[in-house]
Amino acid sequence: GVPCAESCVWIPCTVTALLGCSCKDKVCYLD
């Protein structure tokens, strides 16, 4: 549930996705 400082409104999580972040409510989150 920690914001990863990357949005996913128009494109999916990219750099932060490699760290385990996923898209939730238009923002990339880690747990």
Swiss-Prot record:
Cross-link for Cyclopeptide (Gly-Asp), residue positions: 1-31
A Gene Ontology BP annotation from the UniProt entry: defense response
PTM remark: Contains 3 disulfide bonds.
Disulfide pattern: 4-21, 8-23, 13-28
Domain of life of the native organism: Eukaryota
Keyword Disulfide bond: yes
Keyword Disulfide bond set for record: yes
Keywords of this entry: Disulfide bond, Knottin, Plant defense
UniProt xrefs under Pfam families: Cyclotide
Stored InterPro entries: Cyclotide, Cyclotide_bracelet_CS, Cyclotide_sf
Domain notes: The presence of a 'disulfide through disulfide knot' structurally defines this protein as a knottin.
Function as written in the Swiss-Prot or TrEMBL entry: Probably participates in a plant defense mechanism.
Family membership: Belongs to the cyclotide family. Bracelet subfamily.
Name of this chain's protein: Cyclotide cter-C
